[in-house]
């Protein structure tokens, strides 16, 4: 039986590819998709969800837009990474359908309420919508199997020296998620920076030759340009968000450790840092499965295999 998931995202090139991977995988049943502000403004990320589902001919999936700003802060966006539209590069179709007439939290709550079994929430942007759901609907916590997030890092940040972008945008929301008591799986930079797509991988995807694989290759063409900056020391581009979906499909590709994670909300230099108690120094009980390594070639092979679904 397919695993029911609810996807909360802020497309974003890697979010878009996570959507492609999820909808090419019969093991997963995508119940709804909600959008958050992050990689671009809330209007643009919502539109990008609709554009991707139009491309994939999955306009049957309910969509709703989420919070327009973080819980306690002003919005920061990553337009320097993802371009003016949030999905610069390919020529994507205009949406042929409209979002639901409700908020992201309302759609999430409805989805959980109506599901016969607990739902896995996959969150690949800031955690604002998920935190609002948890705070406003404590009666639905038991309907959440786990929360799989792309965010954080045990080591270096990518937006500040200490913080990864998604967590930095709304650290208060991320702290609510980590301390919720619901199982959390964290795909942080420690693993996503190893999940790099190289130029030859992009050409492999392009050679598959269907309209979706071509769009994915064009998304990666744009994404690779940003990551050529020598400061990163990358061979390719880290494909952050699809790690969440890949872990659900093939957890054997990943190495995880069980650790306690907290989010720094006050630090002068460390706001948004995910503090991972790797050596069990706090005495706190582990609250997250933290991904620390990935079989890069296996990850690329999984993407290539699933892109053939769209032939």
Swiss-Prot record:
Disulfide bonds: none annotated. GO terms for biological process: nucleobase-containing small molecule interconversion; purine nucleoside catabolic process; pyrimidine nucleobase metabolic process. Keywords: Glycosidase, Hydrolase. SUPFAM superfamilies: Nucleoside hydrolase. It comes from the Bacteria. The keyword Hydrolase applies. The active site is at 240. Hydrolyzes with equal efficiency cytidine or uridine to ribose and cytosine or uracil, respectively. This is Pyrimidine-specific ribonucleoside hydrolase RihA. It comes from Escherichia coli O17:K52:H18 (strain UMN026 / ExPEC). The gene is rihA.
């Amino acid at each position: 039986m397919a695993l029911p998931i609810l996807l909360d995202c802020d497309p974003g090139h890697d979010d878009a590819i996570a959507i492609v991977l999820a909808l090419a995988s019969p093991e997963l049943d995508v119940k709804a998709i909600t959008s958050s502000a992050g990689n671009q403004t809330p209007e643009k990320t919502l539109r990008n969800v609709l554009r991707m589902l139009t491309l994939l001919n999955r306009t049957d999936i309910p969509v709703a837009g989420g919070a327009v700003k973080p819980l306690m802060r002003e919005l920061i966006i990553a337009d320097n990474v993802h371009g003016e539209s949030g999905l610069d590069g390919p020529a994507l179709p205009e949406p042929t359908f409209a979002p639901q007439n409700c908020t992201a939290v309302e759609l999430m709550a409805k989805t959980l309420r109506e599901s016969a079994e607990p739902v896995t929430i996959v969150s690949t942007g800031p955690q604002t919508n998920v935190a609002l759901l948890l705070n406003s609907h404590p009666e639905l916590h038991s309907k959440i199997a786990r929360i799989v997030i792309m965010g954080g890092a045990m080591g270096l940040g990518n937006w500040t020296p200490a913080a990864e972008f998604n967590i930095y945008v709304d650290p208060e929301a991320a702290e609510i998620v980590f301390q919720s008591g619901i199982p959390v799986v964290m795909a942080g930079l420690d693993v996503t920076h190893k999940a790099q797509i190289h130029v030859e991988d992009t050409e492999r995807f392009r050679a598959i030759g269907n309209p979706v694989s071509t769009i994915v290759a064009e998304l990666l063409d744009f994404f690779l340009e940003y990551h050529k900056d020598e400061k990163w020391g990358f061979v390719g581009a880290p494909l952050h968000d699809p790690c969440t979906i890949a872990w659900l499909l093939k957890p054997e590709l990943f190495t995880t450790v069980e650790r306690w994670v907290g989010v720094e909300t006050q630090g002068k230099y460390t706001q948004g840092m995910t503090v991972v108690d790797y050596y069990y120094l706090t005495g706190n009980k582990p609250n997250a499965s933290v991904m620390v390594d990935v079989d890069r070639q296996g990850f690329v092979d999984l993407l290539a295999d699933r892109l053939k679904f769209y032939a």
